[in-house]
Amino acid sequence: MIKTVKSKRTSMSNTKLEYSDSWDHLKPLRILVAVFLLNIAIYPAFSDDSSFRSDLASDYTEFVYWLKKASDEKKIPGAAVAIVSREEVKYLQTWGIRENNTSKLVTPESIFRIASMSKTFAGTSAAMLVERDLQSWDVKLTDIFPSLILGNRTSSRKITLRHIASQSTGLMPHSYSNLLDDGVVYGKIKQKFHEIPTVCAPGKCYGYQNVVFSLIGDIVEESTGETYGNFVDQEIFKPLGMTTATVGLDAFERESNVTTPHRLVRGNWRSTTNNPAYYSVAPASGVNASILDMAIWVRANLGAFPDIMSPAFLSTVHEPVIKTPHGNYFNRWANLDDAYYGLGWRIFDYDGMQVVHHGGGVRGFRSEMAFVPELNIGMVLLFNAASTLANDVVPQFLDNLNK
């Protein structure tokens, strides 16, 4: 049922994973179990082999070759990448180590912090509340939390769930992210929401948020009576079969197969500590996951599991809401035309393709994922190092699709 093709090189193995059409009726958990049973044979880690060769299908050979070579040049400690379609995992590979100066290899089950890619789960959670008539996109935040003040009182009374999820609250961008950097947790920062400067009317301009965006967690808890982490686990992770995915620092620290964050110190990657404050804004930055589970997540957003996320549901979540200005790294990609934020996702036009995307970065970790619904193809990358190389991964992948 599953075919594997291995490299003939003795120093390193690559594998292309293929599922036959007869597996289409299986639930994602059963597919994942099958992958787990075969992962030792299917997904061995790369060695430090500068003469990397791939037996991938030609569509991805050049991209994967570039990625491995660039990662070697940057001496990235550990990484994982997957290329998927709606129907299958086309390619999945890990390489390197979970922590510098150890022999602990990154495996397909190794868990990374995915940082701001967590926002895609928050947008989906908000959409589930709306789909179940527990909330509406146009509900005012002050109707849910009467004492809440976000910025000035006039604008605060107009901010909706849609504005929160689409980063269009009109509040100063990155409000209080500096406090997260300093280790101040969400519960304390919320007390200062009324002090946030308002820069435009809600819905009129883009302003990326971590702290304010995390009000989605409060809304989930108020609407369902469940903690945000439990809701995501029960309504997203478990139904999709994402068995290594968790929310929060405690869950991360309970696992043994986790990756360690790394930062550059005088040109060398050194292990560092996790910043617990960013876990306190769980909707913005609190998800942990392996490459196996992130491959499932991209497939789900390509429409692999319509009984969980229907085409209409995905269309809503991936719909552009507010245009994003130039200035961020993704806006400087050469072939990018227009860029928007949707409901927890970025959407942009790239060389004639509509791409759905999000990246992530938190102390010692970088991540990127992007997919093209029209071409039924997507990619996700996880680094246990805060490397700027991640900035180039999505355009390299997309440029390769057009060759």
Each model region followed by its residue ranges:
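N-terminal leader/targeting segments and the immediately adjacent pre-domain N-terminus
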Residues: 2-9, 14, 18-109, 128-136, ...
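Catalytic loop of the DD-peptidase/beta-lactamase superfamily, centered on the K-T-G motif
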Residues: 46-93, 221-234, 238, 272-403
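Second-shell loop/turn segments in exported
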Residues: 50-56, 111-113, 149-152, 176-180, ...
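Active-site helix/loop module of the DD-peptidase/beta-lactamase fold
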Residues: 62, 78, 102, 113-117, ...
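Catalytic nucleophile serine of serine hydrolases
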Residues: 116-117, 207-210
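Short amphipathic alpha-helical face segments that pack within enzyme cores
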Residues: 120-125, 214-215, 291-296
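Mid-domain, small-residue-enriched loop/turn segments at the edges of structured enzyme/sensor domains
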Residues: 160, 211-212
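The feature captures the short pre-catalytic strand/loop hairpin that immediately precedes
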Residues: 187-199, 265-280
